Amino acid sequence: RYRKQGTTDWITVPTEKVEVTGGAFKTCLSGLEPETSYELVAYSDTDESPVTTVTTDIERALPNGGFEEWCTENNIIYPGVTRDEAFWGTGNTGASIAGEVLTDKTTDKRPGSSGQYAALLQSKLAGIAGIGKLAAGNLFIGKYLVTRGTNGIVGFGRPFTQRPTALRGWVKYNCGAITDVGTSQPTGVTINKGDPDNGMIYVAVGTWTPEEYGVCEKETTGDKMLGTDEVPICVDTRDKNTFFNPNSPAVIAYGEL
C-alpha cells in the first residue's frame, strides 16, 4: 500500500501487479507526482512492515528540448547557444563538406507551442568529390566528433541522473519515396527504389563507459578511444561493430517509435 505523505487514505496495489519470487516481491508504482514524498507499507495477511518514506525525482526536461536555441559557427548550424554548449548533435558537420544542411530550425512548430521554432530534419543526397552519398536528417543526444573521408564518427549519450519512465514530445513526419539505394543494406532488410522511407525515434538509458563503448578500432592516428565521460559512445560509420545495439548489456531501458 502507499499514499501521499500527509494524506490519510492508502492505495492498495492490485495483486496482479505484484511479482512474487520465493519470499521476495516487487512492484512498480505509476502515476506518482514529481518531487513528492510517499509512504509505503508492505504487508502479508495481518503482518505489516514499518512505514517507509520515499521522495520522487524532479521531472527534468531535456536541455533545449524545445529546440529554441540555435547557432551558426564556421558556417555550420548547431542546435544550441554555442557549438560547445549544445546538448544535441547532428550530422551537419559532415554534410557541410558537400555544402548541405540536414538539420535546422523551422517556424513550422506544433500548434499551441509557446516557442518560436521546431527542429527540421531532412535526408539529402550529398555530392562529395563527384560521389553521391545519402545523408539522413538526424538529431541525437551527444555531438559530432570527426569526419574521416566521407564517413563520420559521432558521439552518443550525455550524463543523466534521473530515472525516467518515458520520453514525451511531438513529431510530424512527411514520408517520401526512396530514390537512391546504396550497395550496402541492413542485414535481413531489402530496400528498393520507390519504397516509402522510414523515420525513427528511439531513446535509451544505460551505463555505457568510454573504455568499452568509446573505442574506434579503425582510427589509425592518435588515440582510438574517442569517447569521454560526457559522451561515452562512439559510432564510427565505417564500422558496423560500433553501431548502437539496444540489446547491449549496458542498456537499462529502451523504446522506439
Language model: regions and residue ranges:
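Extended, low-complexity, turn-rich repeat/linker tracts enriched in Gly/Pro/Ser/Thr and Asp/Glu
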Residues: 173-180, 192-196, 209-212
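Extracellular low-complexity, O-glycosylation-prone stalks/linkers
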Residues: 1-15
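Extracellular recognition modules
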Residues: 39-43
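Extra-cytoplasmic beta-strand recognition segments
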Residues: 67, 155-180, 187-189
